[in-house]
Amino acid sequence: MKLLESVLLQSYVQNIMPLSSLKMLQTQQRNAQYAAQQRYLANLQAQRQQMQAQRNYNNDPYITNPYSYSYRVGNTVRQTNQYGADVLKQAVNYGYDQGVQAGRADRQDRRPSSYRNAFGYQDANYGYSGQYVAQSDYNYYFREGFRRGYTDGYGSTSQYGSFNNGSGSILGNVLTAILGLTNLR
């Protein structure tokens, strides 16, 4: 539990936009981006509240299961098991979903396309529980999904995935290409 609280607190303290920055969005009449960032922050808070249960290391299958996949973060090769692979997939999907919303918000606000300036891209912790993979790995894959989602949302396209009923989903072949998981068995 301490790790999760530490991760979320670090995200809140270091990466959450100060109130003055949010007010700046309102001043610039960037209402859609302001609303998107407010939703992102509310979702982070809800996530924190949902993950209050203590992690039981004695029965955690992640601890007892051997590595079954390798993956790359930049030029570094890492290894994980099925639980970690699932978290990385989740990171890409959450990133795509949040990217679509941020891209749509910038388009609605008639702002230039700039995924790197989006708060969700900078934070990249949405959905991270502090388990199974390093936070930096989660952030990397979240941003890979975010970038593609932002492109689809800003351009009103479905090049990398789809967005239906308020939820985005990246295409399976795109997900596979991003992750580049290699089975070790």
Model-identified regions with their sequence ranges:
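Intrinsic-disorder/low-complexity detector
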Residues: 2-185
